[in-house]
Amino acid sequence: MVELWQGLGCVFTPEKLLKFITTLTSNSNFCIAYSGGIDSHVLVHAMSHLCQEHPWQLRALHINHGLNPKANDWENHCQQICNRLKIPFQSERVTLSLQPGDSIEAVARKARYAIFQQALSENETLLTAHTENDQAETFLLQLLRGAGVKGLSAMPAKRKLGKGELVRPLLAITRDDLKKYAEKNNLRWVEDDTNLELRFNRNYLRHEVLPILRRRWPEVFAVISRSANHCAEAALLLDQLAESDLQLIQKDSELEILPLLQLTPERQRNVLRRWIYLHGFQLPQTKQLEQIRNDVLLAAHDANPVFSYHTIEIRRHHGKLYLSNALSAHNATPLISWNFSRSLPLPGDLGTLIAEKKKGVGIKTTLDTSKITVRFRQGGEQCQPAGRKETHTLKKLMQEWKIPVWQRDRVPLIYLGDKLIAVVGYCICEGFEAKGEEWGWNVEVQPPK
């Protein structure tokens, strides 16, 4: 990002913004995240000039958090500026739900980006006005949290967002440069007085720490930005190494423990982070990651340990690591009537049963469906899978099928009266399976959305 601006001088102009944007994206539909502050106002103003010379579509999106008594005034200001510049304007209001210990900044940011993600259309680029100053602040915040190279990468210049993408074209421009542009063009922007409140960590860095660093090291913003770029490159290499390791140790969505144990502890931690990240879960802290290694990965081979953090559970079973949302409470006692004709929502987070008529597979359609019920394992059930000569306990069969212990009571069982006739996803019992030209109900579990 910094290299792109070398040789261009420090004065911000729409022409230099054009060079950024065309380097970062080939899209021609843009949506500006417009707060009304000086940074986003400069971006709106410069983009309006570029749109007069290029066949681009441009709109502005304002988020009204309602946290400040002046919030409605800021929204009106943004509306007026966009009307003057003939830019389509949209405002969205959010109500923040704060829990004890929540950071207002973090909750507001999450709500804001949820709206951005939903609002973007296909091939549309969201432009935000984050500057080199913002990048330095983010880097220092992550540093003081003990972040690794991924966190120290701070904000990427470009990433996917919803159906479109997010681009930050001002990451190598300082606020001072934007202020010069704003004053030269007689722009009027809003001032958020909460940006002066030192109780917020970012504000403390902005007003107390960085000015001291800048007096000693005038190029501190550019230097920190360069370090963030180095960290981003290192993080990419670590991700590539993890992907290479996952090719060898991941089967379906589980990790094979033996090949994982052959890696160095550093690569084990790297793989675990990537595995958890790719499943869309919150990454563990360093201490939690070490607990996962010690308590789950390195547990006795016949143990079935579980490690829980946030809303996540990591378990070990039959030489594999499993990752899932924390299991909800499950009542295994209900009998649910079902005639196969409609989908059947299962209790809790177990998903939905669906049945499709097919020839030669599934449960015979000639059965009396008025006697069909769906149940769950209580213990002591017996089953003779179709094609096998002997009856076995369901417990033994589930061990044979290598169903993890914590999932066994959650597998739907289909009964005809008091007779077990199918274990959904695993077998039809002898005498109840459709063969040849016979029609059958092919039953599957549809995971919860």
From Swiss-Prot:
E.C. numbers: 6.3.4.19
Residues binding ATP: S35, G36, G37, I38, D39, S40
Major enzyme class: ligase
A Pfam short name: ATP_bind_3
Swiss-Prot/TrEMBL GO biological process terms: tRNA modification
Keywords: ATP-binding, Cytoplasm, Ligase, Nucleotide-binding, tRNA processing
Localization per Swiss-Prot or TrEMBL: Cytoplasm
Single GO MF descriptor: tRNA(Ile)-lysidine synthase activity
GO cellular component, as recorded: cytoplasm
Swiss-Prot/TrEMBL catalytic activity: cytidine(34) in tRNA(Ile2) + L-lysine + ATP = lysidine(34) in tRNA(Ile2) + AMP + diphosphate + H(+)
Gene3D superfamilies (alphabetical): 1.20.59.20, HUPs
Annotated family: Belongs to the tRNA(Ile)-lysidine synthase family.
Function: Ligates lysine onto the cytidine present at position 34 of the AUA codon-specific tRNA(Ile) that contains the anticodon CAU, in an ATP-dependent manner. Cytidine is converted to lysidine, thus changing the amino acid specificity of the tRNA from methionine to isoleucine.
NCBIfam families cross-referenced by the UniProt entry: lysidine_TilS_C, lysidine_TilS_N
Domain notes for this protein: The N-terminal region contains the highly conserved SGGXDS motif, predicted to be a P-loop motif involved in ATP binding.
Name recorded for this polypeptide: tRNA(Ile)-lysidine synthase
Native source species: Coxiella burnetii (strain RSA 493 / Nine Mile phase I)
